[in-house]
Each structure stands twice: as structure tokens, then as C-alpha cells.
Amino acid sequence: MRALSRKWVVRAVAALLVASSTAGCGFQLRGSNGSYTMPFHSIYLGFPDTSALGTELKRNLRATGQVVIADKAADAEAQFVLLGETRNKAILSLNSLGRVREYLLTYTMSFTVRDAKGVELVPPTQISLRRNMAFDETQVLAKESEEALLYRDMQADLVQQIIRRLASMKPAT
């Protein structure tokens, strides 16, 4: 019994040392802090009103508490211009009968950011995310739900990448 409790104490101390050393070196889980300092106070987002990506980006920018989302481009310090947004589904592999076994889902968007004078703050940038999805024709409805979930996950990843890029941009001087 004594050896068992001693083992447990040694493991607990080792875990504590590992945790404190990773925290001490500045390591943080992605998104654990979530606070970004934006180089502007207001931004206009050039997304269609029905864009789910635009809605999620607005929600995340408002959550920072530092940025006002302008209704008109003329009222904003920065203008986010959506150049393109596409979703694609391609066959990745086939089984021995020639039926689809796997799909490759791709979510690509390109954008630029300009200041109020039209000066480019972020050059045209393209972000492309990919996910593999196994397919089983006996579970079509479940796979449709999985596909929608994967696209939502990629959309959330895109929003986080956009926010990090906005936070890292340098204002025009």
C-alpha cells in the first residue's frame, strides 16, 4: 500500500513539474487567451448579409471588445474586402467497385484589407483549408451531417486565422 501511494506522489510531482515548465516557457493552448490587440478601432466587413463566415467573424471581432463593426466603409478605419469564398468537394479515393470511399473537402477564401484612404494594409491573401471525409453509401444522412460539421469547423478555423492576421497587420503611416 505504501509503495502505491509513493508511486502516485511521484507521478503527481512529475506532472506538476511538466505543467509548470511548459507554462513557464510561455506556452499557451491556441485560443486559450483569445485576446488580440487590433491596430484599428473600427472595421467594415465586406461580406454579403447572408454569409455565415461574415456573421461569425463579426461575432468574434465584437467579442474582443476593442473593435466597432461599421455599417459603411466610409465610417471605418479599416475595410475588409472579401475577394472570393468557395467550398469544394472532390473524390479522394474509390473502393474496388469504383464507388467513392473518401472525399476531400476544401474551403478557400481570399481577402484584402485597406484603410479608409484605400491604401492596402494586407495584400490579397488566400487561405485554404482541407479535410478528408470517409464516405459510406449506407449512411448517407450521417455523412451529410458530418460534411456540414466539417465545413463549420473549417469556417471557425478561417475566422481565427483572419483575426490573427488582422491583429498582426501594421497600420499605414
Provide a role label for each language-model segment.
Residues 2-4, 8-11, 21-66, 171-173:
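A structural "domain/chain start" motif
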Residues 34-36, 71-72, 119, 125:
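Short secondary-structure boundary/capping segments
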Residues 12-16:
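Alpha-helical transmembrane segments
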Residues 66-77:
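Short acidic low-complexity segments
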Residues 81-126, 130-145:
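Surface-exposed short loop/turn segments
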Residues 141-173:
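C-terminal/domain-edge helix-coil "capping" segments
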Residues 61, 65, 113, 117, ...:
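Sec/Tat-exported extracytoplasmic proteins
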Residues 47-55, 100, 104, 144-157:
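Soluble non-cytosolic domains of exported or imported proteins
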